Amino acid sequence: MLPGNEQLASTMNIQLNGETTQLPETITVADLIERLQLSQRRVAVEINEDVVPRSQFPQRHLHPDDRVEIIHAIGGG
């Protein structure tokens, strides 16, 4: 570890909507939604082909190499 970087969190890679994304190791689904500025939108989240209920977003931690798909509803006519 480089001097002065003691407070940097360890990171991991996940697949987010098909793209490799580097995130802190301790991130939850709720944290990710907030980071993506989607917290005010209606979203559906799937991790490794399993749908995650919105009620579990705050408790569901992501893990290295998870495959995450996030979709959000867009109104239209």
Model-identified regions with their sequence ranges:
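Ubiquitin-like/PB1-type beta-grasp interaction modules and other compact soluble beta-rich domains
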Residues: 1-76
